[in-house]
Amino acid sequence: MARIAGVNIPDHKHVLISLTAIYGIGRTRAGLICKNAGIETDKKVRELSDEQVERLRGEVAKFVVEGDLRREVAMNIKRLMDLGSYRGMRHRRGLPVRGQRTRTNARTRKGPRRPIKK
């Protein structure tokens, strides 16, 4: 099992799919990484040589992925909350941020219903 960006990527899958196991890399970016590293996307990870895995590591290192990306996203949300912007207030209150309706639905963001006490 190859280890790239601190993640064990599955070796029984194609390189394109295996790279998506890394947080911050989707199929499009995985394809771009394979192209820049000069590796066919339909090759399985276990078929790659050590030199090819090193080239993949070098290409992945050019992007912000895993812990750094998670930290960056968390800091962006914290910044919005500290500014007191509308989006920050919605994050703080645990409500939908992107304009969805809340009169009905939005249960995922709001959590389970609380009964009204009389």
Swiss-Prot record:
One Gene Ontology cellular component annotation held by this UniProt entry: cytosol
Top-rank lineage group of the source organism: Bacteria
Record bears the keyword RNA-binding: yes
Keyword set includes Hydrolase: no
NCBIfam families hit by this protein: uS13_bact
Assembly behavior: Part of the 30S ribosomal subunit. Forms a loose heterodimer with protein S19. Forms two bridges to the 50S subunit in the 70S ribosome.
Biological role stated in the UniProt entry: Located at the top of the head of the 30S subunit, it contacts several helices of the 16S rRNA. In the 70S ribosome it contacts the 23S rRNA (bridge B1a) and protein L5 of the 50S subunit (bridge B1b), connecting the 2 subunits; these bridges are implicated in subunit movement. Contacts the tRNAs in the A and P-sites.
Official protein name in the record: Small ribosomal subunit protein uS13
Phylogenetic lineage: Bacteria, Pseudomonadati, Pseudomonadota, Gammaproteobacteria, Methylococcales
Gene, per the UniProt record: rpsM
